[in-house]
Amino acid sequence: MISILVTGISGRMGQAIQEAVTQNPDTCVGSTHDQGQELYPALAKCDVAIDFSHHAFTSTLLAEAVANNKPLVIGTTGHTELERQEIVDAAASIPIVFASNYSVGVNALFWLTRKAAQILGGSCDIEVMEMHHRHKIDAPSGTARTLAEILSGAIDRNYEDSVVFGREGLVGPRPAKEIGMHSLRGGDVVGDHTVIFASDGERLELTHKASSRMTFASGAVRAALWLQGREPGLYTMEDVLGLSQL
């Protein structure tokens, strides 16, 4: 049985992760951690850590995980470029699954988006829309950013130059190479994501809607189990699910 450290235990996702770990017959909660608590004692007694806390905690977690040779599943979003680079650097020493979304359905959306972009992208106007609950603190969501990165790569565009975050005022006709990004917040929406490919005469929409955080939590536990025995490296949920081989 794999012993798992759950960080950010007081948060919504921390609670969901704890429940998912408890429900899985192959895992147990070895320890939990929250802001202000010492990390080493909690990490030392576990086989792997699942982190859905806050991006500002990532540097501390990475340092302790590397020092103690512990695999990590990182689901926190909103990282700065420096923090993302720290994750890449740490993956040279330990195996890390780093994903913006651990839902199996969302990762199918990632795969489908890449394929659709390869078929349609060059001739379509592309827009990404996401909606989350009123308490979410970052925008756009990590999942929406991943979708835009997938789209940019699939149609050979630069993310920074192509993505436009919302529109206001007299912006003029839509440039063909734009990828529009739109964030909505309200209510208790767990997470909705839509990719739109619009051309003259037709429109393709790919949509995923999550109704429970348990879908993310169960995917993160699946990733933690998959990490056991892996070589150091930076992995994604597409690796965990085998989608990168399709």
UniProtKB/Swiss-Prot annotation:
GO terms for biological process: diaminopimelate biosynthetic process; lysine biosynthetic process via diaminopimelate. NAD(+) binds at residues 8-13, 75-77, 99-102. (S)-2,3,4,5-tetrahydrodipicolinate binds at residues 133, 142-143. The lineage of its organism: Bacteria, Pseudomonadati, Verrucomicrobiota, Verrucomicrobiia, Verrucomicrobiales. It is an enzyme of class 1 (oxidoreductase). Pathway: Amino-acid biosynthesis; L-lysine biosynthesis via DAP pathway; (S)-tetrahydrodipicolinate from L-aspartate: step 4/4. Its main location: cytoplasm. It comes from the Bacteria. It catalyses: (S)-2,3,4,5-tetrahydrodipicolinate + NAD(+) + H2O = (2S,4S)-4-hydroxy-2,3,4,5-tetrahydrodipicolinate + NADH + H(+); (S)-2,3,4,5-tetrahydrodipicolinate + NADP(+) + H2O = (2S,4S)-4-hydroxy-2,3,4,5-tetrahydrodipicolinate + NADPH + H(+). InterPro entries: DapB_C (IPR022663), DapB_N (IPR000846), DapB_N_CS (IPR022664), DHDPR_bac (IPR023940), NAD(P)-bd_dom_sf (IPR036291). PROSITE patterns: DAPB. SUPFAM superfamilies: Glyceraldehyde-3-phosphate dehydrogenase-like, C-terminal domain (SSF55347), NAD(P)-binding Rossmann-fold domains (SSF51735). One of its GO terms (cellular component) is cytosol. Gene3D superfamilies: Dihydrodipicolinate Reductase, domain 2, NAD(P)-binding Rossmann-like Domain. CDD domains: DHDPR_N (cd02274). It comes from Akkermansia muciniphila (strain ATCC BAA-835 / DSM 22959 / JCM 33894 / BCRC 81048 / CCUG 64013 / CIP 107961 / Muc). Keywords: Amino-acid biosynthesis, Cytoplasm, Diaminopimelate biosynthesis, Lysine biosynthesis, NAD, NADP, Oxidoreductase. Belongs to the DapB family. Its EC number is 1.17.1.8. It is found in: Cytoplasm. Catalyzes the conversion of 4-hydroxy-tetrahydrodipicolinate (HTPA) to tetrahydrodipicolinate. This is 4-hydroxy-tetrahydrodipicolinate reductase. One of its GO terms (molecular function) is NADP binding. The active site is at residues 132, 136. It holds the Pfam family DapB_C.
